[in-house]
Amino acid sequence: MLAWLRGEQDLAKLVKRGLVVGKGFVKMGGVIIDPSHCWHITIGDNVTLAPNVHVLAHDASTKVFLGHTRVANTKIGNNVFVGAGSIILPGVTIGNNVVVGAGSVVTKDIPDGSIAIGNPARVVKSMEAFLEENRQLMKPDNVFDEQFTLRNSSFGEKEREALLAACEKYGVAFVK
């Protein structure tokens, strides 16, 4: 009941209606998965939808002019991260091993192993290049374990200062 009051969707109810969701699915706050046509949506294994992502399977813009709403199958592959505030439009297929950058509007298919950003989303590099760039940024003093996250109940000033210092020195830090 509390989730409903916050405007959160009941994932179990969507699955009962026909939404297909793989293992390891993470749906953060404010995510909207098209409730009126969820059976047209398939989400693979190890997918994260960051806050306020919308996944659509219908387009009602045709209703006024044609008397019918356009619907299409929307598919998200395995090992996909969709950044905050992104919108995935009906009929799109996002391949495996893909990152969609925050705020992107996915209007066309995204191939396997891609990084896509923008409005409309376009592929800007391969997953391989993205991972190599980030590996190069990882140094012994800017990579931290779970102790340096809020999942650690004793996270405090010392951990916060270490993270801030690493970001100041390298421009970025990495946490588990």
Task: List each model region and its residues.
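Short beta->alpha connector loops
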Residues: 8, 30-39
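Terminal amphipathic alpha-helical/low-complexity segments used for targeting or macromolecular assembly
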Residues: 1-18, 121-176
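Flexible, solvent-exposed loop segments that connect beta-strands
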Residues: 62-68
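Left-handed beta-helix
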Residues: 23, 28-29, 34, 44-45, ...
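Short N-terminal helix-initiation segments at or just after the protein's N-terminus
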Residues: 16-29, 60, 174
